[in-house]
Swiss-Prot record:
Residues covered by the Pyruvate carboxyltransferase domain: 5-257
Protein name, as recorded: 4-hydroxy-2-oxovalerate aldolase 2
EC supergroup of this enzyme: lyase
Site keyed Transition state stabilizer: positions: 13
Organism expressing this protein natively: Mycolicibacterium vanbaalenii (strain DSM 7251 / JCM 13017 / BCRC 16820 / KCTC 9966 / NRRL B-24157 / PYR-1)
Keyword line: Aromatic hydrocarbons catabolism, Lyase, Manganese, Metal-binding
GO BP field: catabolic process; L-leucine biosynthetic process
Positions contributing to substrate binding: 13-14, 167, 196, 287
InterPro entries hit by this protein: 2-IPM_HCS-like, 4OH_2_O-val_aldolase, Aldolase_TIM, DmpG_comm, DRE_TIM_HOA, PYR_CT
GO molecular function terms listed in the Swiss-Prot or TrEMBL record: 2-isopropylmalate synthase activity; 4-hydroxy-2-oxovalerate aldolase activity; manganese ion binding
Length: 337
């Protein structure tokens, strides 16, 4: 039986973290058009923290979500336009507006133990007729059976697929496999499973492959790995590996390579790679989007970024607690344990 993979590109959503959510609609349209020509199944677009994520806490966007969504919707003919929504940040009204502008798929994201807060948004998206996924962030912080129970909740609300979301790039291949298999044990056969990997431990492609081998059919990836921390699963090597395995997908490898090298890499103000800071994210199990916040605090208060990230991991901070990074930096600079 041939394995078919649904490839969703996240360059224009998770990738926003890598460029501080600052990109022109023109460049968004260029990237979206290139991805569409390259044959990806879906293109996710929004502020890095989802609809309405632009703020002082998460980082202000250079443009509105609507400008970016319009740019993507106007540039694609085949790929599904997708967005991300975090309940408590994005609202049902904003989901309606995204739908009006051409978004037909949404991932409703919560912390891995808080699926219950997604009920209203998932149900409303289904009422709109959207393709709806549950997105359990920081999946390394819950054991497989506990995570699967949260996935089952999202399914009960109406999610048609649920993701193992390795926001901290902390999972190993065995960890991913165990979580996907735990999902499969409790979810209906018709409910798809997805994987969202980060490269902080240099395992993004390997983890995505392990997930597919365990039964996942949806894979997040991005051009040149554009994403928070050391980036997401780089789409070019993932597609190359998928070809070697004989998996079915619609992507043109050379077209993806061209888009990555000619369009995306030149837009960066910081290399997206495994280095001493991003490796620390994975090792300490820290939310990948905390990287730029920690680097800013390091520069301001004269504290090693790695020390900040290790303390963030020790405290178990999660998305939405970005303000605590400054508190940690101040404490470390004052020698307070």
């Amino acid at each position: 039986m041939t394995t078919t993979v649904y490839v969703q590109d996240v360059t224009l959503r998770d990738g926003m973290h890598a460029i501080r959510h600052r990109i022109s609609p023109r460049n968004v349209a260029r990237i979206a058009a290139a991805l569409d020509r390259a044959g990806v199944d879906a293109i996710e677009v929004a502020h890095g923290d989802g609809l309405a994520g632009s703020s002082l806490s998460y980082g202000p966007g250079s443009h509105t979500d609507w400008e970016w969504i319009d740019a993507v919707a106007g540039a694609v003919t085949n790929a599904t336009v997708t967005t991300l929504l975090l309940p408590g940040i994005g609202t049902v009204a904003q989901l309606d507006e995204a739908y009006r502008r051409g978004v037909r798929s949404v991932r409703v994201a919560t912390h891995c133990t808080e699926a219950d807060i997604a009920a209203q948004h998932i149900a409303h998206a289904r009422e709109l007729g959207m393709d709806v996924s549950g997105f359990l962030m920081m999946s390394h912080m819950a054991q497989p059976a506990d995570l699967a129970a949260q996935a089952k909740l999202m399914e009960s609300f109406g999610a048609q697929s649920v993701y193992v979301t390795d926001s901290g790039g902390r999972l190993t291949m065995h960890d991913v496999r165990d979580r996907v298999l735990a999902y499969r044990d409790v979810l209906a056969p018709s409910t798809q499973i997805g994987i969202h990997a980060h490269e902080n431990l240099s395992l993004a492609v390997a983890n995505s492959v392990a997930a597919v081998e365990a039964g996942a059919t949806r894979v997040d990836a991005s051009l040149a790995g554009q994403g928070a921390g050391a980036g997401n699963c780089p789409i070019e090597p993932f597609v190359a590996v998928a070809d070697l395995f004989g998996w079915k997908h619609g992507c043109d490898l050379f077209a993806l390579q061209d888009a990555a090298d000619d369009i995306v890499r030149p837009l960066r103000d910081r290399p997206v790679r495994v280095d001493r800071e991003t490796l620390t994210l994975g090792f300490a199990g820290v939310y990948s989007s905390f990287l730029r916040h920690a680097e800013d605090a390091s520069a301001r208060y004269g504290v090693d970024t790695r020390a900040i990230l290790v303390e963030v991991g020790r405290r178990g901070l999660i998305g939405g607690q970005e303000d605590m990074i400054v508190d940690i930096a101040l404490s470390l600079s004052a020698g307070v344990p």
